Amino acid sequence: MPRPGQPRPSSGPPRLGPWERPTELCLETNDERSQPPPGRRTRRPDPKDPGHHGPESITFISGSAEPANEPPTCCLLWRPWGWDWCRAAFCFRRCRDCLQRCGACVRSCSPCLSAGDPIEGSSEAAWAKEHNGVPPSPDRAPPSRRDGQKLKTSMGSSFSYPDVKLKGIPVYPYRHATSPVPDADSCCKEPLADPPPTRHSLPSTFTSSPRGSEEYYSFHESDLDLPEMGSGSMSSREIDVLIFKKLTELFSVHQIDELAKCTSDTVFLEKTSKISDLISSITQDYHLDEQDAEGRLVRGIIRISTRKSRSRPQTSEGRSARSTAPAAAPDSGHETMVGSGLSQDELTVQISQETTADAIARKLRPYGAPGYPASQDSSFQGTDTDSSGAPLLQVYC
């Protein structure tokens, strides 16, 4: 029984004042059972991810969620925190792979929803950034940068730029099969151009020598192991031997020494007409051009002049000229030595007999003969002319 003066209770639910009305009230029944709001979930980053060093909260922004109809305002599932949880559930399955590879989905789900595979440039940019002032570690570099490091180590520490070109030719070409194959955009795939032949002396009828250094000629005959100039032709050594024989037939050793002194001047070609004739004969006989014939002739002259121990072969013309020469009267010895063809290569020396003229000439020279007395220097005794002792020059003051 209610007390008098109190309002009579109604059979329905009690009415509450505006200050006692609950903030959320829903009388609708849903098939899905409302779940309590989950706690804040954290996910540790993948150890392969170099950009994150600690746990991060998973927050997803849906890029493909269908806009639903406006739900009743009393449903707890459509509150802000509930909608965030639903978006995370929808996006988690599609972003799971991206979470393991690039770690970009922990901030935004849009990169993984738009493209399935991570972009290589983004991974390199993320690797190049410093994290908390610490430079990036090379152990966690992306695959493209690791391949570049392997390429640099294979080339060596002294050269680390494989795409450098000099006049269009790559400086470091890929010559070995063990070298890594360059990519399509690399400029190292071009092969080196073959250098032009440096030998200009021989005509095109002869094949080029594999040695390629015939210009640097040796002065010793033992080093003349030059290859053949062509099939069926004379070798370079045989040509030099024939030039040597022609030089020794035309000139004496002394004349060859004199020619060797002027080989660097144009006087060599103007020295005698025999040189020009010899050059023309070498050019015609051995099918060489004039420049090569001159070079071989100069080398032969220098070789003969620098080899003093080699004996000069005597020709038949020299022997016949000496045998037919008339017997000359004994002289002071100068003509005899010149006529004998004495040279430094020959060891035999011929000396003529001393005449009275030689003895008088030796006495005229002071201290000329060994043991000559000093008292006879001014008297000149034993000569055919007498001297009065007067001075030959008179000085007038």
Swiss-Prot record:
Gene Ontology cellular component list: anchoring junction; cell cortex; cell junction; cell leading edge; cytoplasm
Superkingdom of origin organism: Eukaryota
Record's compositionally biased regions (Pro residues): 1-16
Annotated keywords: Cell junction, Cytoplasm, Developmental protein, Differentiation, Phosphoprotein
Biased composition (Polar residues): 201-211, 375-388
Modification sites for Phosphoserine: 218
Region spans: Disordered: 1-67, 124-158, 191-214, 304-339, 361-392
Protein task: Plays a role in the regulation of the epidermis formation during early development. Required both as an inhibitor of basal cell proliferation and a promoter of differentiation of basal progenitor cell progeny.
Name of the protein described by the UniProt record: Keratinocyte differentiation factor 1
Ranges of biased composition (kind: Basic and acidic residues): 44-55
Compartment(s) where it occurs, according to its Swiss-Prot or TrEMBL record: Cytoplasm; Cell junction
One annotated GO biological process: regulation of epidermal cell division
Record field: transmembrane: none
Biased composition (Low complexity): 321-330
